[in-house]
C-alpha cells in the first residue's frame, strides 16, 4: 500500500500542488492526466525528491517520510524504493544499452556482473531490444532510448515505478510493446504512477485515473468512469474530444 498525504509545492509564491492525497494498492497502475501545468510531473519529481515539496508525507508499506523533516538517509532510501523514467531518457552516452541497464543493478543492488547481465538482458528483451543491447545511445532512435530507460527502471524492481510520458518518443507500432511490459510488471506486483498525454495508452493500461486541475485532484475513478462518465464539468470538457473513442 502506498499513501501520499497533503503533498504541497509552491514556485515563486504560486501553489502548483495543493494538498494532494493519493492512495495506491500494490500492483495498481495510477495515471495522472490533465492540461499542461496541472502539476502532474511535479508530483512525480516531488515524490522522488528531485523537487523539494513544501509539505506532505509518503508511506510505502512500513517506510514513512515527512517531507518537512526528511533526512539525507531517508532520501537515499526513498530513491531506492522509487524508480523514475524521464522524458529525456538520461542514458550514459558512452555505455551500451546493456551496460546502461546493468549499472544500477551493480552499484545499488550490489549484484555480480553475471547476475546483472542476466537481469538486464531479460528486461531489454521485454521491451523488444534484444538485438540492440550492444548499441550505444547515439545509434539508437528516440523510441529505443525510451525503452532502454524503461528496462533500466524495471530491472531495479522498485516498490513504485514513476513514469513521465513513457510512450512520448515511441513510434506507434512500438507503443504496444511498452504497454505490455508495463502491464506484465503490474501483474507481478509492480506499483506505478504514470503521467501521459496519450489517452489511449492511459485507457488501456491504468487501473485508476486522476484528473488534475491547477494543482488539485479534481476527480478520480476507473478509466471508464473518467473518460465516459465524468462528474465534474471541467473533466467533461477536457475529455470531450476523447470519450467517444472509448464508449
Give residue ranges: language-model regions:
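A short, surface-exposed alpha-helical micro-motif characterized by mixed small hydrophobic
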Residues: 202-204
